């Protein structure tokens, strides 16, 4: 799976604050829209990352779109959530 430049895949090896820092770094690099992707058990962690971002940045971040679905990996269906975040100036 290739990761896009503005896509952050939430993984179990990193904690929530590390993912929040990754999003803030992307915003500071000039990227206006970031996609958070959480799969399986990391769906709740992706939502926690958004809530922590909202607490830190307040009205500086906006939730544009939420998409849920499932994908097939190794003949198993894995649920996912995509959170599209936009930097508001």
Curated annotation (Swiss-Prot):
This is DNA/RNA-binding protein Alba 2. GO terms for cellular component: chromosome; cytoplasm. The gene is albA2. Belongs to the histone-like Alba family. Zn(2+) binds at residues 14, 18, 22. Signal peptide: none annotated. Forms homodimers and homotetramers. Homodimer at pH below 6.0. Forms homotetramers and higher order homooligomers at near the growth temperature of 80 degrees Celsius and pH 7.0. Interacts with Alba 1; heterodimers lack cooperative DNA-binding behavior and result in more compact chromatin structures compared to Alba 1 homodimers. InterPro entries: Alba-like_dom_sf (IPR036882), DNA/RNA-bd_Alba (IPR013795), DNA/RNA-bd_Alba-like (IPR002775). Binds single-stranded DNA, RNA and double-stranded DNA. Involved in DNA compaction. The keyword RNA-binding applies. It comes from the Archaea. It is found in: Cytoplasm; Chromosome. The modification N6-acetyllysine is found at residue 12. Acetylated. Acetylation at Lys-12 decreases DNA-binding affinity. Keywords: Acetylation, Chromosome, Cytoplasm, DNA condensation, DNA-binding, RNA-binding, Zinc. One of its GO terms (molecular function) is double-stranded DNA binding. GO terms for biological process: chromosome condensation. Its main location: cytoplasm.
């Amino acid at each position: 799976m290739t990761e896009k430049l503005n896509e952050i895949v939430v993984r179990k090896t990193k904690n929530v604050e590390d993912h929040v820092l990754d999003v803030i770094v992307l915003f500071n690099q000039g990227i206006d829209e970031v996609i958070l992707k959480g799969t399986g058990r990391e769906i709740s962690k992706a939502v926690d990352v958004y809530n922590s971002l909202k607490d830190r940045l307040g009205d500086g971040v906006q939730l544009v779109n939420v998409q849920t679905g499932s994908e097939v990996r190794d003949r198993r269906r894995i649920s996912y959530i995509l959170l599209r975040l936009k930097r508001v100036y």
